[in-house]
């Protein structure tokens, strides 16, 4: 006979607050560089929605806006430095 080990209590999942709703942003624009920089890591990568706390649709719009801003030379593709 084997005995089951008691399981530790599971903490309830706490959802991150949406930063776009907190800032009352209705439209994501590639020209709003200050907003887009919040969703880019210090290495220049686009942060995942698991980290940022945005919805799927908002993440798609953010990534498109960041890519457009990079193409228009408003944002760098990568950081300069070591």
Swiss-Prot record:
It comes from Bifidobacterium adolescentis (strain ATCC 15703 / DSM 20083 / NCTC 11814 / E194a). This is Small ribosomal subunit protein bS18. The keyword Iron does not apply. The gene is rpsR. The lineage of its organism: Bacteria, Bacillati, Actinomycetota, Actinomycetes, Bifidobacteriales. Gene3D superfamilies: Ribosomal protein S18. It comes from the Bacteria. HAMAP family: Ribosomal_bS18 (MF_00270). Part of the 30S ribosomal subunit. Forms a tight heterodimer with protein bS6. GO terms for cellular component: cytosolic small ribosomal subunit. Binds as a heterodimer with protein bS6 to the central domain of the 16S rRNA, where it helps stabilize the platform of the 30S subunit. InterPro entries: Ribosomal_bS18, Ribosomal_bS18_CS, Ribosomal_bS18_sf. The keyword DNA damage does not apply. One of its GO terms (biological process) is translation. Belongs to the bacterial ribosomal protein bS18 family. PANTHER family: 30S RIBOSOMAL PROTEIN S18, SMALL RIBOSOMAL SUBUNIT PROTEIN BS18M. Keywords: Ribonucleoprotein, Ribosomal protein, RNA-binding, rRNA-binding. Pfam families: Ribosomal_S18. One of its GO terms (molecular function) is structural constituent of ribosome.
């Amino acid at each position: 006979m084997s005995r089951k080990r008691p399981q530790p209590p599971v903490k309830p999942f706490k959802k991150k607050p949406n930063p776009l709703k907190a800032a009352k942003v209705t439209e994501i624009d590639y020209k709003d560089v200050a907003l887009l920089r919040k969703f880019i890591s210090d290495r220049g990568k686009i942060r995942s929605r698991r980290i940022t706390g945005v919805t799927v649709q908002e993440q798609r719009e953010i990534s498109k806006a960041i890519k457009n801003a990079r193409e228009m030379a408003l944002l760098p593709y990568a950081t300069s430095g070591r």
